[in-house]
Regions:
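Short Gly/Pro-enriched turn/cap motifs at secondary-structure boundaries
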Residues: 54, 218-226, 232, 249, ...
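Flexible glycine/proline-enriched surface loops and loop-helix/loop-strand junctions
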Residues: 153-163, 238-245, 360-363
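Conserved Rossmann-fold dehydrogenase catalytic segment
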Residues: 123-124, 152-160, 183-199, 219-224, ...
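Conserved PLP cofactor-binding pocket of PLP-dependent enzymes
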Residues: 311-334
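Aromatic-enriched alpha-helical interface/lid elements that frame and gate functional surfaces
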Residues: 230-313, 317
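N-terminal helix-loop segment corresponding to the beta1-alpha1 unit
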Residues: 1-184, 341
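Flexible, small-/acidic-enriched active-site or ligand-binding loops
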Residues: 340-367
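Oxidoreductase and adenylate-handling cofactor-binding alpha/beta cores
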Residues: 168-188, 202-212, 261-272
Length: 367
């Protein structure tokens, strides 16, 4: 499935957010030309992961070096912009304008261009426009780092560049939507994608609640979104090798908690007595006592044992794994097959696109 075949994308992005956006476009069939600075290129080429990480984010693209500080380089880039369908960058706002490649410059020679600017704070709001940003900086600025962890504790950032990734996904989504609209209107479009906007999308439900009530979200640690007393991470007994474990349980409703009680050997009717109805998600009449009793009971078996028993009973549950452990297990059961990507002479195994589409048994192909 290559729905973007024939789409020409000029890519002035680097690091994660922008390259991920154009990676998705390339994997969906677009012809992506990635412009890098001479003498080093994208900073990811020289980081600890080296060529493998760069390949994972840039497979399927044609990479060229252009010096945007030279008149010849700017002229070459402008000529490429004249013939592209989409131009995307994630430099600090103003960088391409200084090179004569801003939205108005490109629009003047290519009225139908979809011009996507990806930045920390957006390009349309003067007070914030010049600000630089990285993933962890945006997590701090938007309050994301104050959603994790426990009340009264230090800030806790998400352990991977979640904002960068979401920004890339949103940029690819926005560009695809703008391309579709252009087919109807024949007009180009300036698409402005900010990292703070992506952060609010990740915190969508919490953001809506703040707008509706003005209340600052509570820090919930490892508790589930539902607020159910049985939706949390709990310590379990050590496994056969003596390794301690944790079990994540998602018993959000009274009915699910009744099933949990059955697995524990408790009377399901007891759940009715200890829980309050009428809240949507389950609420305990005495939350502290409820959790203490449940936590104590879950220490009787290993996390693996609880996972199997609870899932069999219809209660969402999973033992705590690290990423490598999960990927090995997913491959072992045939649920996950790594996708091999190649860029130049480097081949790297990746998780693919995160989805499959198989009309008539034909899987999506990746470059």
């Amino acid at each position: 499935m290559q729905p973007l075949t024939g789409l020409k994308v000029l890519d002035f992005s680097h690091v994660i957010a922008g390259p991920l956006a154009t990676f998705y476009l390339a994997q969906l069939g677009a012809q992506v030309t990635k412009v890098e600075k001479p003498g080093g290129g994208d900073v990811l080429r020289g980081n600890a992961m080296g060529a493998a990480q760069f390949t994972a984010l840039n497979a399927g693209k044609d990479c060229i070096a252009i010096d945007l500080k030279s008149p010849e380089g700017r002229a070459q880039a402008l000529e490429l912009a004249r013939h592209c369908d989409v131009l995307l960058d994630n430099f600090r706002p103003g960088a391409l304008e200084r090179a004569g490649l801003g939205w108005q410059d490109v629009r003047a020679i290519n009225p139908k261009v979809i011009y996507c600017s990806v930045s920390g704070y957006g390009t349309l709001h003067a007070p914030w426009k010049p600000r630089g940003a990285y993933d962890h900086v945006i997590q701090a600025a938007t309050g994301m780092a104050m959603l994790g962890g426990e009340a009264g504790g230090p800030p806790l950032k998400v352990g991977f560049p979640v904002v960068d990734v979401m920004t890339g996904v949103l940029a690819a989504f926005a560009v695809t939507a703008a391309v579709q609209e252009r087919q109807r209107t024949g007009e180009g479009r300036l698409v402005d994608v900010s990292m703070w906007g992506a952060a609010l999308q990740l915190m969508y439900t919490q953001s809506v609640n703040v707008l509706a009530t003005g209340a600052v979200p509570e820090r919930v640690g490892n508790k589930g979104f539902s607020g159910s007393p049985a939706a949390e991470y709990f310590a379990a007994a050590p496994d056969a090798q003596g390794k301690p474990g944790h079990i994540a349980i998602g018993a959000n409703t009274v009915e699910q908690i009744a099933k949990l009680y059955g697995v524990l050997g408790w009377s399901p009717e007891q759940a009715e007595a200890e829980l309050e109805r009428g809240h949507g998600f389950a609420r305990a009449k005495n939350p502290v006592q409820f959790r203490e009793r449940l936590a104590l009971a879950l220490q009787a078996r290993s996390a693996q044992d609880w996972e199997e028993r609870l899932q069999a009973a219809g209660v969402p549950a999973a033992r705590l794994r690290d990423l490598g452990e999960f990927m090995q297990e997913a491959q072992a059961v045939g649920a996950f097959v790594p996708t091999l990507l190649q860029q130049g002479g480097v081949q790297v195994a990746t998780p693919g696109l995160g989805w499959t589409c198989q009309p008539a048994g034909q899987a999506v192909k990746v470059k």
